[in-house]
């Protein structure tokens, strides 16, 4: 069972809502901007997915071509990109989370303690960006688990520098943990070309971008 080791904290900061002259003209209720988080549970959401080229993983059918193009660009740059995780349905996420809770309780944790600890490793069901079908963990090779200390930093820099060219952003950047609760520099999220360029230029996470339209 593959698991991502995540830095997770209680979110306290509010998204940036200052005004921008170059704000893209988009329908913020569209599928590209769906947020899955503790504040936005998407338990009933089931996207149509297609297989990613060269992988057993799947991705939202409307964005899979963009992901394939990003992966090709990585290969052309000399990397061997590996999809660690892409679409993960609710029931799979629920099983991973409950397995982690049970493991923690066997070690002596109370249910509350076990759930708190489990959330650092596996997002509670309905709160994972992977359920949107628009998020993928991309690394440079297979790892038994993901952490900022083990994944190739040079590849993560390449990913951050190039993903917007294909409509993606880093979903959980290190400088937005106070808003997102996570630090996952390998986790790309499809938001479309215009949003990706804008978010990258202005250093915004998805929560901050969506808040600009509220």
Describe these PLM feature segments.
Residues 6-214:
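Extracytoplasmic cell-surface/polysaccharide-interacting catalytic and binding patches
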Residues 1-5:
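Short, small-residue-biased leader/transition segments that mark boundaries at the very start
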């Amino acid at each position: 069972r593959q698991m991502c080791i995540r830095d997770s904290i209680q979110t306290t900061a509010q998204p940036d809502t200052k005004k921008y002259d170059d704000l893209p003209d988009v329908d913020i209720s569209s599928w590209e901007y769906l947020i899955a988080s503790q504040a936005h549970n998407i338990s009933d959401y089931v996207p149509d997915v297609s297989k990613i080229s060269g992988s057993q993983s799947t991705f939202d059918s409307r964005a899979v071509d963009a992901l394939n193009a990003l992966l090709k660009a990585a290969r052309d740059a000399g990397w061997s990109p590996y999809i660690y995780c892409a679409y993960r349905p609710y029931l799979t996420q629920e099983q991973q989370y409950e397995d982690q809770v049970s493991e923690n309780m066997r070690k002596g944790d109370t249910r509350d303690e076990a759930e708190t600890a489990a959330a650092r490793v596996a997002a509670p069901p309905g709160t994972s960006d992977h359920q949107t079908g628009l998020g993928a963990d991309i690394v440079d090779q297979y790892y038994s688990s993901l952490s900022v200390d083990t994944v190739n930093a040079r590849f993560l820099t390449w990913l951050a520098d190039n993903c917007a060219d294909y409509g993606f952003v880093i979903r959980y950047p290190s400088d937005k943990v106070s808003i997102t609760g996570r630090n996952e520099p390998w986790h790309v999220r499809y938001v479309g070309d215009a949003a990706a360029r804008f978010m990258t230029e202005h250093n915004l996470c998805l929560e901050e971008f969506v808040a600009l339209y509220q």
